[in-house]
Each structure stands twice: as structure tokens, then as C-alpha cells.
């Protein structure tokens, strides 16, 4: 358990990963300083303020990656920082200035704030699988030594390219700065994060993960040879590595691999009411899975709790409960008949 007097800061706290991490940190006994862009926007922060222990152990702080020095105050006095915030605008018209530069400068600004505070014991950065395997030819297995090909991303400009570039360049710049300035810095590299969630809107990773249900064809390529982790496993790994005295370097956090064909087979069996496609234009019927190795994370003692089915059922249930994906009419009628109106969003 965290000490009740131990304060930690979570950036991007209202988002998909950030809000679940805040919930788990509060449960573990930490006092949490949550940074958000606008603490007065009730629609964006209500799910944080409604959390158990929020009244006594949670404070909201205004900070923005584009505003240099805006995290200093929230980080001052904290013993740990979880930097989760990242610009996620795949439709940006000016990706260099709206996504890439703010991501790099924002992470360096967090590192500088940790230095200035003089109280921060460890900084945990949520990186991305997009820093590892985005390259022309996929390897069968990836580990923490691999880095994405930034020039390949810039030339091909696939869906999400600016996110992959921004996270890769930011993490590389941060490692250089952390080593030069002797900062205890670790990065966690999640693959596609799936599961139930607290935020009121559709998380970007579920737009991708649930793309066969949502018919988001431009995202099929991302999950062609997919790797997945449950949101709860990811957040628990953050706390585990923060507390572990020997944690160092990069850690891939991924529990399952599945090709798009394996994924839709499971989704079609689970949700026959959605007309989920079985053929995907430009995607071979015979795909080999691509594996992201979490060997390093497992070897330090972390154990994953959730199955691939757990992730997707949790995600679909949460989306339905929040009205983000339609429930087909026949399913609604069946639910009403059996009084199944209480949809669990997970814990």
C-alpha cells in the first residue's frame, strides 16, 4: 500500500489510462494530484471527482503540455510522477506543431519539473507500442531493444503516423535527458489498450480496437497483427514498477497477440448481433501473429490477470452503458425481458 502521506502526480488524468490509474492509486492509499487541461470543465472531470476517496485524497491541477512550466506546481512536493498525457489527434492538419512538438517538449518539461521539485523519486512515462514496431517489414518478435522507423512513418503517413513519430522521438529525447541529469526514469510500453473505462467519451484506442464492430476501415491495418493489454493490467503495472526498487529502463506491457482474423472470430461468436466483417481488403487471409515480449516485466514479478475476451467484453459493455455504441434492437428487448439493465463497467 502507498503511504497516505505519499503524494504522486498523474498527468492527463481525465483520459482513458489516466483516470483508471488515478482510481487504482487512490485504492492503493496514495494522495493524487491529477493534472487536466481544464479543471472547471465538469463534463471532463466528473468521473474523477466521483471516485471513492476523491474528496480526501484527490486534487485537480490545471496544466497543458503546450504551456511550458505549467506542471511545475503540481509536481512540487510529489515523490512520484506518472506521465500519461499525450496529444492524440489523428486528424490533425498540422501534426508537427499540434502533435509531435508538444509531445516531445511536454515530456522534457515534465523531466525538468521533476528536477526542480527535488522531491521526485521516480518518473514513470507511458510510452507506446508505436515506438517499437512501426517499420516496413514486421519481425516475428519485438522487445524493449527495438525502435520504430521514424522516417518510414513520415514517408508512408499511415493512420496514426504522427502519434508513432511523436512518442518515439519524445521517448528517445527523454532517455538522453534522464541519463544526463541522473533522473530515475522508466517507460512502460503498452500495446493496444482495451477494457472498461471511466471517461464519458470513446477512448481513441477503442476506436481502433473495436473497429471491426464500428466499421472503422482505416484502422484495420493497425490491428492486422495486433497485440493487446487490459487497461487494468496496464495501470497495475505502472504502480508495480513505481514501487519496485529494481525497476529500470523500458518495459513492454502486452498480454495477448491476435491477428485481425482471430479477433473477429472471437467478436463474431460473442456478438453475433453486430454484422462484423470476415474479409478485409488488402489484408491476407493467412497472417502470422507478431509477438510483443513482456518477458522483462514478467521476470520482475508482474502477473497479468485478464484474458483477451475479458478486455473486449469489458470494453463493449462500457461503451454500451455509456451509449457510445448501439445495442441492436433484439438485444435490447431480450435484456429488458430478463431485467438485465445493470451493466457492470468493471472494477
UniProtKB/Swiss-Prot annotation:
This is Bifunctional dihydroflavonol 4-reductase/flavanone 4-reductase. GO terms for molecular function: dihydrokaempferol 4-reductase activity; flavanone 4-reductase activity. Bifunctional enzyme involved in the flavonoid metabolism. May use dihydroquercetin, eriodictyol, garbanzol (5-deoxydihydrokaempferol), dihydrofisetin (5-deoxydihydroquercetin), dihydrokaempferol to a low extent (5%), but not naringenin, 5-deoxynaringenin or butin (5-deoxyeriodictyol) as substrate. The keyword Oxidoreductase applies. GO terms for biological process: anthocyanin-containing compound biosynthetic process. The keyword NADP applies. Keywords: Flavonoid biosynthesis, NADP, Oxidoreductase. It catalyses: a (2R,3S,4S)-leucoanthocyanidin + NADP(+) = a (2R,3R)-dihydroflavonol + NADPH + H(+); (2S)-flavan-4-ol + NADP(+) = (2S)-flavanone + NADPH + H(+). Changing residue 93 to K: In strain: cv. Conference and cv. Pyrodwarf. Optimum pH is 5.75 with dihydroquercetin as substrate. NADP(+) binds at residues 44, 163. It holds the Pfam family Epimerase. SUPFAM superfamilies: NAD(P)-binding Rossmann-fold domains (SSF51735). InterPro entries: Epimerase_deHydtase, NAD(P)-bd_dom_sf, NAD(P)_dehydrat-like. Belongs to the NAD(P)-dependent epimerase/dehydratase family. Dihydroflavonol-4-reductase subfamily. It comes from the Eukaryota. It is an enzyme of class 1 (oxidoreductase). Its EC number is 1.1.1.219, 1.1.1.234.
Amino acid at each position: 500500500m502507498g503511504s497516505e502521506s505519499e503524494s504522486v502526480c498523474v498527468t492527463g488524468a481525465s483520459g482513458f489510462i489516466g483516470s483508471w490509474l488515478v482510481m487504482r492509486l487512490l485504492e492503493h492509499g496514495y494522495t493524487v494530484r491529477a493534472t487536466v487541461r481544464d479543471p472547471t470543465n465538469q463534463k471532463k472531470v466528473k468521473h474523477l471527482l466521483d471516485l471513492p476517496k476523491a474528496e480526501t485524497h484527490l486534487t485537480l491541477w490545471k496544466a497543458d503540455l503546450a504551456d511550458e512550466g505549467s506542471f511545475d506546481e503540481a509536481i512540487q512536493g510529489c515523490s512520484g510522477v506518472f506521465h500519461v498525457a499525450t496529444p492524440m489527434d489523428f486528424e490533425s492538419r498540422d501534426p508537427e506543431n499540434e502533435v509531435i512538438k508538444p509531445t516531445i517538449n511536454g515530456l522534457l518539461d515534465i523531466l525538468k519539473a521533476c528536477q526542480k521539485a527535488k522531491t521526485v523519486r521516480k518518473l514513470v512515462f507511458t510510452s507506446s507500442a508505436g515506438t517499437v514496431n512501426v517499420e516496413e517489414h514486421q519481425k516475428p518478435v519485438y522487445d524493449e531493444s527495438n525502435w520504430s522507423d521514424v522516417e518510414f512513418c513520415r514517408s508512408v503517413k499511415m493512420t496514426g503516423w504522427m502519434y508513432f513519430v511523436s512518442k518515439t522521438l519524445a521517448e528517445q529525447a527523454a532517455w538522453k535527458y534522464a541519463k544526463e541529469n541522473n533522473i530515475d526514469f522508466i517507460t512502460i510500453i503498452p500495446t493496444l489498450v482495451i477494457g472498461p473505462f471511466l471517461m464519458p467519451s470513446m477512448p481513441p484506442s477503442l476506436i481502433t480496437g473495436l473497429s471491426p464492430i464500428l466499421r472503422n476501415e482505416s484502422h484495420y491495418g493497425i490491428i492486422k497483427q495486433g497485440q493487446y493489454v487490459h487497461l487494468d493490467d496496464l495501470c497495475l503495472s505502472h504502480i508495480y514498477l513505481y514501487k519496485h526498487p529494481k525497476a529500470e529502463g523500458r518495459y513492454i506491457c502486452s498480454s495477448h497477440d491476435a491477428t485481425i482474423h482471430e479477433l473477429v472470430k472471437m467478436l463474431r461468436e460473442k456478438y453475433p448481433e453486430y454484422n462484423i466483417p470476415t474479409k478485409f481488403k488488402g489484408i491476407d487471409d493467412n497472417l502470422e501473429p507478431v509477438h510483443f515480449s513482456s518477458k522483462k516485466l514478467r521476470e520482475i514479478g508482474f502477473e497479468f490477470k485478464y484474458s483477451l475476451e475479458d478486455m473486449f467484453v469489458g470494453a463493449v459493455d462500457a461503451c454500451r452503458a455509456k451509449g457510445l455504441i448501439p445495442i441492436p434492437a433484439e438485444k435490447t428487448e431480450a435484456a429488458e425481458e430478463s431485467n438485465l439493465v445493470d451493466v457492470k463497467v468493471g472494477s
